[in-house]
Amino acid sequence: MRKSILTLSLAVLMGSFGANANPAEGKTRVEMGINESNLLAADQNRYTYKNMQEFMKTKNVDSGASTPILLSYAEQQLGDVHFLHQGKAMTLQGMLEKHRADAFVVLKDGKIVHEQYFDGQTERTQHQMMSVTKSFTGIIAATLVAEGKLKRQVQISEYIPELKGSAFGDASVGKVMDMSNNVKYSEKYEDPNAEVFQHMKTIGFAPMENDYNGPKTIHEFLSTLNKEGSRQHGEEFHYISANTDVVAWLIERVEGKPFNVVLSERIWSKLGMDRDAFIIVDDEGTALASGGLNATARDLAKFGQMLVSQGKNLVGEQVLPKEAIQSTQNGGDVDAFEKGGYGAKGEVFEGWSYRNQFWHTNNSNQAYTALGIFGQWIYVDPTENVVIVRQASAPTSINDVWDGEMLSAIDAIISQLHQQ
C-alpha cells in the first residue's frame, strides 16, 4: 500500500474518520464544536480549512500593489463529464460531492472553462492547502538553482552549518529537494514517540504537554533528526515533510529573507493574484513550508498556468526561469520512487516520480501535480495547456481509491477539452 504523503494527519487531531453529512455553511465554530483537539477532524475541517487564521499563527504572503490580472471565461465551457473508474460509471459532479470538494477550477489555454464552489466557499476564500505548499517551496528552490545561487550537488551543511550533525548534514541539496535522502522520521500516528508528533507540536497542530522538553520550533526540530540504518542518500524515495522545511531554510539562508517574503517577491506579487495568501508559522515566525499555505482557488490556478506557460504570467511576463520549470517538468527518478514503496504496478501512482517537490505522472503529456492531504490538488498538463485546481475537506487524509477516481476524472476532462 502507498505510504502516507503528508505528515499533517495526526490521529489525535483527526478524531473520528466518519463524516457527518451536515456541512459547515452558515455554522459558527462554536456550533461545530471546534477546539484545539479536533482541528483536522472529519466534520470540523469543513470549517477550519476555510478559516485557519482563527486557529493558527500565520504570516502574510503579499500579492503586491499591482492590479490583479483577472481570469477570463472561455466561450465554450466544460460540459457534463462522465467517466469510468475501474469499470464503474461516475460523473464529475458526483465525485466532487463524494470527495467533499470546496472548490474546483479548470483552466484551458489560460481561461476558465469550469468554476464551482461548495459549502459556502467563494472565489475569495483562502483555503488550507496542506502539502501543496511543498511545490511552491520546491519551485522557488529550483529557481535559485537555475540562477546559480543554490547548487544541487552541494551538501546541506555548506549552507546550513546548524544541520551539520543531523541526518541532513551530508545530504546534497538535490537529494533533499527530491526526497531521496536518508532520514529517520516515523509517521506512525499510534506511536506517541514518532517524529511526526514533535514536528507538529512546533506549529501547534499537536499540543505540548506540561512536561514536554523537546524541540519547540521547526528549526530546532530539524536539527534533532538522525539517519536510519545504512541506506545511502539517493537510493530510494522517502517522502517526509521535514525535507521541505529544510529546503525552505535553504531558501531563507540564500535569499537572506523570511520564506513568506521570498514567496511573495518571487511568485505571489508577480502573478496578478486576486488576494494575499497566508502561511502558518511557529513561535519564531518560521513558516511551515511543508504544509501551511492558504490561498484562493483562482490564485492557485494562476500559479498552475504560470507552470504550463514555462514561467510566464497571464500577460506574458517571465516570472520564473524556464530552466526551473523544465527541470520539474522532466520528472524524477522512477526507480528510486518505486524502491521507496511508491509507483509499483497496480498502485495509484504507478510509474510516477518526484522532482522539485512535485509528483510527476511521467505520461506522454509530461503532466505533474502538487498534492496535499484531504483532497488538495494543482494538476498541470503542459501539452494540453490545462490546469486543474481542487480544494477539499475530505473526511480522511489519504484515500487511494479517491485519488484514482480523481485521476480518472482528470483524464476525462482533458480528453473532453482536447476534442472541443
Regions found by a protein language model. Give the residues of each.
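Catalytic-site signature segments of enzymes, centered on catalytic residues
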Residues: 123-124, 188-190, 202-284
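Active-site helix/loop module of the DD-peptidase/beta-lactamase fold
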Residues: 146-188, 257-291, 295
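Active-site-proximal alpha-helical segments within enzyme catalytic domains
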Residues: 178-179, 242-250, 289-313, 376-392
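N-terminal leader/targeting segments and the immediately adjacent pre-domain N-terminus
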Residues: 19-121, 178, 182, 222-224, ...
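Structured C-terminal helix/loop/strand segments within mature extracytoplasmic catalytic/sensor domains
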Residues: 22-35, 367-420
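Active-site Gly/Thr loop motif
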Residues: 273-278, 329-387
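Gram-negative bacterial Sec-dependent N-terminal signal peptides
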Residues: 1-21
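Active-site SXXK
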Residues: 110, 128-152, 176, 247-251, ...
